[in-house]
Design a protein with these regions (language model features):
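Short beta-strand segments
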Residues: 34-66, 82
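General beta-strand recognition
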Residues: 60-62, 131, 138
């Protein structure tokens, strides 16, 4: 059996108290203060991840998309996960939203959510609007050595 070369350079587990579970209110605050996430979907080939810019309104995540594999995946399997991470107050955080995505077809709902005004990362036209209704929102905050 070959020895694991990474075992010798691995860091020790975080000391007790360095990782904190965030309550849902704090998770929503972080989600509202950020606008870029990763969208995890699943299709016939398995999991896939897409960069995503989003907005939060009434504890629902809204985004827009151009036609392509992301929309195909969302149609095949509407259960998704969204993850954001970053630095807040000198500590790292990660927030994960698991939920169900639905396409928005009603113009009034699209305008009310303001997703139609959401800038796109690529600057391309994106006329497909979606909402993610959370089933679960979780988050952690932790210190790093960097």
């Amino acid at each position: 059996m070959t020895e694991n070369p990474y075992l010798q350079t691995s860091t020790q587990p975080a000391a007790a108290g360095q990782t904190h579970i965030l309550d849902e209110t704090e998770c929503w605050r972080l989600l509202a203060e950020n606008s870029v996430a990763r969208l995890a979907v699943s299709d016939d080939l398995g999991p896939n991840i897409f960069p995503l810019n989003y907005l939060v309104k009434s504890q629902v995540l809204f985004f827009r998309s151009a036609p392509g594999s992301k929309i195909v995946s969302l149609t095949q399997q509407p259960r998704v996960a969204v993850e954001i991470d970053g630095t807040d107050g000198g500590k790292r955080f990660s927030v994960v939203v698991r939920g169900d995505v639905r396409r928005l077809n009603d113009d009034a709902h699209i305008h009310e959510s303001t997703v139609d005004t959401l800038p796109t990362m690529t600057g391309s036209d994106k006329w497909n609007y979606f909402a993610i209704t959370p089933r679960q929102v979780t988050g952690i905050r932790f210190r790093t050595s960097r």
